[in-house]
Amino acid sequence: MPFSLGQRWISDTESELGLGTVVAVEGRMVTVMFPATDENRMFSRADAPLTRVIFNPGDKAESHEGWSLTVSEVEEKDNLIIYHGIHDETGEQVSLRETLLNHNIRFNKPQDRLFAGQIDRLERFGIRYQCQQLRHKLATSDMLGLQGPRVGLIPHQQWIAHEVGRRFAPRVLLADEVGLGKTIEAGLIIHQQLLTGRAERILVIVPDTLRHQWLVEMLRRFNLKFSVFDEDRCVEAYADSDNPFYTEQLVICSLELLRKKRRLDQALAADWDLMVVDEAHHLEWTEDAPSRAYRIVEALSEEIPGVLLLTATPDQLGHQSHFARLRLLDPDRFYDYEAFLKEETNYADIASTADALAGNEPLSQEIIDNLKTQLAEKDITAATDIIQATDADVDQQQAARDALLQDLLDRHGTGRVLYRNSRASVKGFPTRIFNQYPQKMPAQYVTAARVGAMMNGHLDTAGKVKQALSPEKIYQEFESSSASWWKFDPRVDWLIDFLKENRREKVLIIASQAETALSLEEALRTREGIQATVFHEGMSIIERDKAGAYFAQETGGAQALICSEIGSEGRNFQFASQLILFDLPLNPDLLEQRIGRLDRIGQNNDVSIHVPYLEDTAQESLMQWYHKGLNAFEQTCPSGHILFNEFSESLLNVLISQDKEVLEQVLSDTQTRYAELKSVMEQGRDKLLEINSHGGERANKLVNALAERDEDTNLIGSVIRLWDIIGVEQEDSGENAIVLRPSEHMMFPTYPGLPEDGITVTFDREMALSRDDIALITQEHPLVQTGLDLITSSETGTTSVAVLKNKSLPAGTIFLELIYMADASAPKSSQLYRYLPPTPVRVLLDKNGNNLADNVNYESFNKQLSAVNRHIASKLVNASQAVLHPLFAKGEEFASSELTLLTESSRAKMTTQLNGELERLEALKAVNPNIRDEELAHLREQMVELNGYLDGAVLQLDAIRLVLVSHA
């Protein structure tokens, strides 16, 4: 497309942005500014979804200053349009450059199409109205952003996302224990912030090894297309922008990239709304010497309004490091470590009070006295009397307990910035059952190990241990490439026997190396014909998806999935409960990550862990250290990496020497230290914080409401009908799944987000959770949103003519059905949609101009109508013109009255909600310094802004249906 600075264009997919102006044309990209909504968009010049706005003679063109002219001549000069015509108020001859056009101009004129004979099919009018209703329903949902992600409805995860995701610029530390889903919580918050417009530009900083995992998680679970940035991508992006970070809205990068000063400076200047930092417990800090990584994140946190830090159990690197992370979130609040420690001493009393309230026993006098002190500004007598009464209603007692508990939570020192759930406080985890299978060391391995010791004497301790743990690699190294260790390794024999004995079980097998995984698949296939598939880092995302889907299939699927260490990162297989660790990693965190593929929230069965090992080898010694020293197979071990760091030298030495006495001493010392650390961590548990983090009964109510929406059959019917109308090919693939493909007969040339080779979808959350290759369709899914946008941003269904066969009415009786959209242009970040989203207003007029909409239900009326062909419809319209013209003016009067009611209702709702939240936070600020001044200021500014936007609410005629009564 030919673009020039100053030209006016509209977005085909986001018409609500108003009239845009080309502000930059660089390389392959064009940037368009939309002043009405204060938005910028960058498009590819080759296929930008934009339409040039050019008025014709006879049209009215409005200036941004408010005056308008009737166009008599259109002049093009230097690729820009100049309109000449008569000023509508003064009658003078005037000119208007296109750059000075009103930014809020709307362009749909259904009545022009109706009188021009451009009449749509009857069902298209219905689908358009339905689409507008669906968009309105989603925009007004109090759970917007929570239903769409392909995640289980886990109460504590949904609660944290609900609480944090609706804040302006949240600054929060997510510190759940392993397996509780911190990444999912972060993804839910990101998804909610994006859908609600609170954030648009997001930077995710993760370790190098987790970049791919985050990319996959965000795409597969949240339908968010992040871009991974490394040095090569930054260099490539220079063709489009001086700052590479401006070329994408959603970016994942590593800390390593930001260690380069130039890249850090560019990231600091990139106007992010939200930053997410994974593995934040690795940010080392001391008051005198903060690490380079810490200083990088600190610099970014000073520029970026919203910050999410994801960390393991907060105190596992020491309490000072925990304070340092809180300091990143709010340096004014957490300014001094000693002051923080002093403040924390007060939390113990609050926690014991909370424990008592959370229970069912009557409160002791000591607890009541504590409550009166802790909630000194409130009169709690009535609440405590209800709790203590022996004849009080149980629900009333629970409500009184909950109210007092909420008051305590609001006053808790870190309750708004720190969320931490532990397995002790969250139900739903399976039991781990550990099984060990000793095997004799094959003679071939003994010989290979002896030769290896002579040949590789130069290796350091870590290298020797690696060899000792993988004798099959040494054997393969010294034998010919055709030699196959799996033909004599007793662990393989045991594996085959196990799979044959458990043919009905899905079995996940994990090995350290991709080569080992491939060899095992070959062994199972060639020796016994066992159906297995592999999953390793050398495969593409699509190949891994297919392997995972083959494993997940209940009928005809693979019995076993064999994963390498890296290949299994970020993938969970809760539908399986049998885990075989063919070898063991030399890292407790990796062991926990392996077990965590199955042992997660949502696992319905006990998890059986099977470890075949070679007797009297490093494999057995390492297995004993994990089992007897850390109890790592049967329990999670948050202190695992601390213990490994403390004992690594003695452990590595004993793995090589195989000295039994030394091993026993290492095991004994590890057990003692493990018990010490476990005790310290248990004492450090903050019960009040856990209550706040998992949400209790409020979280359960939220999840139940989401589950009810999953069962909405009306939505399923509406979406399938939408795809039918658009022309998407739909094929039932069984198991509650549908394959969608573009067809040659689609209403639109492209359907963004629908792949050429199709996509498999389901409306069943459980099905989607068990199959990585199946998308979960909800009202929030991009395929649904895009479908709604395709219909509502086009002229589809804006005009229709129908016949009503009803002999109780005179033949030829006319009804005019008008659908208006009440709307106001505002930046998405203003949150106006919460109070006045685009709202369909229906008017149904008889020939005398009476509005029958309140008395005649749309659905029942629609069912009585019959379609007519376009030729006859056009004749009927022409014959009715004299009656129709005055009815349009009458319809606008009724719609305007409805707009006034909508606006005032929206204003009242906004004032009540925001004033209530402001008063609550102002009251809390007196007792909890964690309430940030920025949040209060934002609420005040938001109320002023929203009142202004509501004053600018307008009506737009969206669709017309002419109905004539016939007796034929």
Curated annotation (Swiss-Prot):
SUPFAM superfamilies per UniProt: P-loop containing nucleoside triphosphate hydrolases
Q: Which gene encodes it?
A: rapA
Q: Which GO terms describe its molecular function?
A: ATP binding; DNA binding; helicase activity; hydrolase activity, acting on acid anhydrides
Q: Entry's PROSITE patterns?
A: HELICASE_ATP_BIND_1 (PS51192), HELICASE_CTER (PS51194)
The record describes the protein's role as: Transcription regulator that activates transcription by stimulating RNA polymerase (RNAP) recycling in case of stress conditions such as supercoiled DNA or high salt concentrations. Probably acts by releasing the RNAP, when it is trapped or immobilized on tightly supercoiled DNA. Does not activate transcription on linear DNA. Probably not involved in DNA repair.
Motif DEAH box, per the record, lies over: 278-281
Keywords assigned: Activator, ATP-binding, DNA-binding, Helicase, Hydrolase, Nucleotide-binding, Transcription, Transcription regulation
Positions of the Helicase ATP-binding domain: 163-332
Question: Binding positions for ATP?
Answer: 176-183
Q: For the Helicase C-terminal domain, which residue ranges apply? A: 491-645
Q: Which Gene3D superfamilies match?
A: 2.30.30.140, 2.30.30.930, 3.30.360.80, 6.10.140.1500, 6.10.140.2230, P-loop containing nucleotide triphosphate hydrolases, Tandem AAA-ATPase domain
According to UniProt, the name of this protein is RNA polymerase-associated protein RapA
Enzymatic class: hydrolase
Q: Which family does it belong to?
A: Belongs to the SNF2/RAD54 helicase family. RapA subfamily.
Q: Tell me its EC number(s), please.
A: 3.6.4.-
> How is the quaternary structure described?
Interacts with the RNAP. Has a higher affinity for the core RNAP than for the holoenzyme. Its ATPase activity is stimulated by binding to RNAP.
